[in-house]
Amino acid sequence: QLPQDRETLFYFNLREIPPRSDKPNVLQIALQTKIKLFYRPKAIVAAPGTVWQDQLVLHEEGNGYRIENPTPYYITVIGLGNTPKQSESGAFEVVMVAPKSSVQVKSARYATPYLTYINDYGGRPVLKFTCTGGRCSAKKA
């Protein structure tokens, strides 16, 4: 039984290996594909256009941030920086934050952090955060 209060993540791994050819000078290519599949229960389906990623909270900890995800959805964070441009193209190790959990990331500290994530449509929106007392919240657009 899958949880009904949060998304569940599955990976579909596919390896395509062509049959051995008896012809000389043949180029054969083996492909491996990994697809992420998300099961989203009816109980948590959001209206189209709803932005739940702005509920993320950044906590200043150690030599970076702890990204807290209080939502029932997986969120893939692909950038964190001091400006929107740095967040979109800077050096950052991509992390996927599971529903109702948190993950630690190494990063410089910023007065106004910007975070880039991947939405349901493959877009890469940027969130601006404001920090108070080591806790950073996304500003509503």
PLM segments and residue spans:
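Intrinsically disordered, low-complexity Pro/Gly/Ser/Thr-rich segments with frequent PxxP/GP/PP motifs
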Residues: 1-2, 86-114
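Terminal connector regions
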Residues: 2-40, 112-141
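Generic structural detector for well-ordered beta-strands
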Residues: 36-38, 57-59, 66, 96, ...
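Low-complexity, acidic Ser/Thr/Pro/Gly-rich terminal tails and inter-domain linkers that flank the onset
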Residues: 42-60
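Asparagine-centered strand-capping/turn motif at beta-strand->loop junctions
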Residues: 65-71
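Short acidic/proline- and small/hydrophobic-mixed sequence motifs that coincide with surface turns
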Residues: 72-77
